[in-house]
Each structure stands twice: as structure tokens, then as C-alpha cells.
Amino acid sequence: MLVVPAIDLFRGKVARMIKGRKENTIFYEKDPVELVEKLIEEGFTLIHVVDLSNAIENSGENLPVLEKLSEFAEHIQIGGGIRSLDYAEKLRKLGYRRQIVSSKVLEDPSFLKSLREIDVEPVFSLDTRGGRVAFKGWLAEEEIDPVSLLKRLKEYGLEEIVHTEIEKDGTLQEHDFSLTKKIAIEAEVKVLAAGGISSENSLKTAQKVHTETNGLLKGVIVGRAFLEGILTVEVMKRYAR
């Protein structure tokens, strides 16, 4: 099972937004480049980096940080405001192959195929709040059945998703794996679970679901609990495979 540390960037700094709300932003006095380098040295093979400024405000203020982080691009899945082929290609030229996309894919599913044509490995971000699918930096929502949506996107080459429970994101509440498990099994896609991966109990449950889904639950993304030391690097490594 993959355990993926998460680093969100806002105003050029490491940050977390509780439930995805800008007014509930927590900033951390951590250097993002040093943090990523240390995690790779500790043996983590994948780091989740999201440009919140670009996702929410369509701002390029974090680009200098992304350029510095590109040294470690092979270990990073990058997301946040990837809504055009031009921007995806710009990130690809920096070395970022694994890119997280959402809003543009909901508007135009063929975007998945277009990304593969420029050697990008797209990962769809399925963000849910109370059973509704959210997009545009979680500022908009729509009543869409997640499983039906994913089955349709598979026709365009979808293979893997990140499923975030927005109501749990950044709250340190426990992730409810029942919906994540249902999505993985019924849609037959690989899933990284996010939002509420907040304790060792979360990791134990994830490991159990990983086995029950024959690996379709590929792993978990750990954000605030990691940044605040609630889940230490040592504990996360214990569950990482």
C-alpha cells in the first residue's frame, strides 16, 4: 500500500485549507523543497503536491516553487488548476509527468486522451462532499453519481483517481472508507484515498481495505496529520509498501 505525504502550496508557502475553504487556511513554517527532499531520503516514492493558488485563484504565484521542486519531479504527482493542455505541457517540460486533473475532465473527458498524447499520466481527482461531486477548486458542486461518472471516464482511458472527502479534509477527522471502497470495486479503478487520513487507525483501516479490494485501494494521502506530526514519518513508513 502506498502512503503518500501531501504538501499544498498557497501564497508560496506550505499550507492546508480546512474543508477546502480559503478562509480556513493554516500556514506551516516549512520549506517545501527541503520537505520534499527529506521525504524522498526517507524512502517515500510519491509525494502529493497541490498548487492551491492556481486551483482557486488561477494564480501563478507558486510557479517559482514548482520550478525548484522540479528537481524531484519523478517522485511528485502535481495538481491544482491544470485546465489546459498548454499548462499541462508546461508542467511536463518541468518534468512533472503524473498530473492530477478534475474540472477540465468533467467539461471535456477527451482531455484525458489529450494528456496522454503529450506523455502525461493523468490522475482524476474525484472530490466529494455529501455525495455530491465538487470541482473548480471545490467552489462548485453537482449532483453526479461517482461510479457512473468514473465508468464513463474509463472510456477515455481513466485508470486511477484520488478520492477526497472534502468534509474531512484538513479536519483530522477519520476518513470514511465505505464510499471509497464502493467506488474502487464498482468502478474498477485504482484509488488513492484522501481527506481524514488522520491517525494510525486510518492507516490500519486502509491496509484492510487495500487487501479487500485486491489492491484497487492503492494507498492513502496524508496531509495535515503528517505536517503536524500526528502521523510521524516512522509510523507512515511502517504501513508503506
From Swiss-Prot:
Changing residue 48 to A: Decrease in activity. It catalyses: 1-(5-phospho-beta-D-ribosyl)-5-[(5-phospho-beta-D-ribosylamino)methylideneamino]imidazole-4-carboxamide = 5-[(5-phospho-1-deoxy-D-ribulos-1-ylimino)methylamino]-1-(5-phospho-beta-D-ribosyl)imidazole-4-carboxamide. Changing residue 127 to N: Almost no activity. The keyword Isomerase applies. The active site is at residues 8, 127. One of its GO terms (biological process) is L-histidine biosynthetic process. InterPro entries: Aldolase_TIM (IPR013785), His_biosynth (IPR006062), HisA_bact_arch (IPR006063), Isoase_HisA-like (IPR044524), Isoase_HisA-like_bact (IPR023016), RibuloseP-bd_barrel (IPR011060). One of its GO terms (cellular component) is cytoplasm. Its EC number is 5.3.1.16. It comes from the Bacteria. GO terms for molecular function: 1-(5-phosphoribosyl)-5-[(5-phosphoribosylamino)methylideneamino]imidazole-4-carboxamide isomerase activity. Pfam families: His_biosynth. Pathway: Amino-acid biosynthesis; L-histidine biosynthesis; L-histidine from 5-phospho-alpha-D-ribose 1-diphosphate: step 4/9. It is found in: Cytoplasm. Keywords: Amino-acid biosynthesis, Cytoplasm, Histidine biosynthesis, Isomerase. Belongs to the HisA/HisF family. PANTHER family: 1-(5-PHOSPHORIBOSYL)-5-[(5-PHOSPHORIBOSYLAMINO)METHYLIDENEAMINO] IMIDAZOLE-4-CARBOXAMIDE ISOMERASE. Monomer. This is 1-(5-phosphoribosyl)-5-[(5-phosphoribosylamino)methylideneamino] imidazole-4-carboxamide isomerase. It comes from Thermotoga maritima (strain ATCC 43589 / DSM 3109 / JCM 10099 / NBRC 100826 / MSB8).
